[in-house]
Structures are given as structure tokens and as C-alpha cells.
Amino acid sequence: AASDIAKIRTATVEITSESAAYPTTKSIEIRQAGAVDMAELLDVKFNADGTAEDLSAMKMPIKAFAGSTLSMIENETFGYIAKFDPVTINANKITSGFYIVDFTQNLIFQNAIADGFSMELYVTAKDYGESGPIPMGCHGGGGVAITWQDKDNYWTFEPYIGNYSACNTPPLGEVPEETWYHVVGVWDGTGSAGAIKLYLDGEIKAERAPAKGNSFQFPGNKWFVIGGDAGAANEADRAYKGQIAVARIYDRALTAEEVKLLYDTLEE
């Protein structure tokens, strides 16, 4: 079964034969039509007590840095949503109010990222007049991040492939109220034109070639932060203000059809 922060996508059913002489039982998997395969590398589930767990097959450890700036909101669709409310938006060296997914020792995770991946967020944003808070990132001399450029109100997906390779949506105009966005960044593992794509609310908004080649460079700090960007050990930079319901990483380049299905599922 899929995570309980999304619709059920598959179910396993056991069938036993009626034969008395040779009763047999077998399992079959029933798949929801049009379903998107689950995220292979990270699928975050937020819990009522402020902890979080990874429902993907990778089962990455997720460490919560609790504090008054991090709270949970119960939600009928997602179970619980994480709310980040830092004292100072975009602050560096914060020590509470975020999560860390450390992959320093996980070479399988690193190799999966290195040859192409997708990041998915369902996140709120608002015009706070600040510069570039990050809802999820592993950035700094390499890595990747999704950034809310709230000085001009647009989203950026920026993997480091030869150099920083920012892919930006067009400006969204005024965003005076907290607004939900489905943001998906994709890199297909190549150095070709259109290898990097950025989708917003189910539609492609930008694409480009990597800055140079097709070699993904990891930063020194090999961990993702949810609610900010990777900083020093047990710290986060670029503190984010908003709510996050979905945070996933896929070991593949999602297609336009898959991204649209993911967005449509959220809107059901």
C-alpha cells in the first residue's frame, strides 16, 4: 500500500483455492489505474508528536529538531502537516524547527541521486519580502534545493551539475496570502537541453540544460533539510516559513504525465 499521506495506489490480496486435495494460496497485487509509482528514495510522513518517518523503500532516518517554531497541523487528507514558523525568515545557523535526512553513509542513496532524480513538494508560500528561503535543500558548493524566491515571488529548482543550474518559474505576481503550491523539480541524468525541468501545479514552467556536462556534485554536508537548507552539523540555514504536506525524492525523472497525476491526486 502507498503512504497514508496520499491515496492508496496498490493493494495485495491473498487468494486460496477451493481444492481440498491441494489447497494453495497466492498473492496478487491490484494496482489503481493511472497511479504513479511511489517515491523510491524519500517519502516523508509527519506524525502528531512532531517526529517524521520515511515511507519509501529506502527507509531513511529522519531526525526532528523540535522547538516552538515547529508544529503539526492535523489534516483530513495528509494526516499531519508540518508548520515552520521561524523567528527570522531565511535565517542561518538555526538549531531547532526543522528536520534532517542524513545520507552521508548511504552510498545507494547517493548513487541513485547522481544519475537523475526528482524532488516533489506540496508547500505553502507567501510574499514575505525576503530573499530565498528554502523549504527543502541540500545546498552549498554542490547539491540541490527548491527555493521560494519571495522577493519576486517565483520558484527555483537548482541542482549543481557542472555548476549551479537554476531552473525558475516565471514570477507569480502578488502572493499576499499563504498559498499552496505543488512544486516538482526533475533532472533526467543527462547534459542535454531540457534535462532539468520545473513543474508548478501540474504544469511545466521551465526547462534548461545543466551548466556543464552531466555530473552531479554533492556538497560537503550530505544531508537534506526539510524546513531549510543544509548547514553545519545539527544546524540549518535559509529557514523556511510555511507549511509542508508532501516531501518526496524519486530515483527517476518523473514524466509530465506523472507530475500531472500527482497534482490531480492532491486536488481530489
Residue ranges and their predicted role:
Residues 1-7:
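Short, surface-exposed loop/turn segments at beta-strand-coil junctions that are enriched for proline
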Residues 7-19:
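A short beta-strand micro-motif common to beta-rich folds, especially ectodomain repeats
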Residues 22-35:
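C-terminal edge beta-strand
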Residues 34-91, 206, 260-268:
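Extracytoplasmic low-complexity segments
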Residues 37-42, 48-56, 88-157, 190-195, ...:
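Extracellular glycan-recognition modules
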Residues 63-94, 120-130, 145-214:
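Extracellular glycan-interaction surfaces
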Residues 103-119, 172-181, 215-218, 237-243:
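Extracellular/lumenal carbohydrate-interaction signature centered on repeated Trp-anchored short motifs
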Residues 208-243:
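Flexible glycan-contacting loops in extracellular carbohydrate-active proteins
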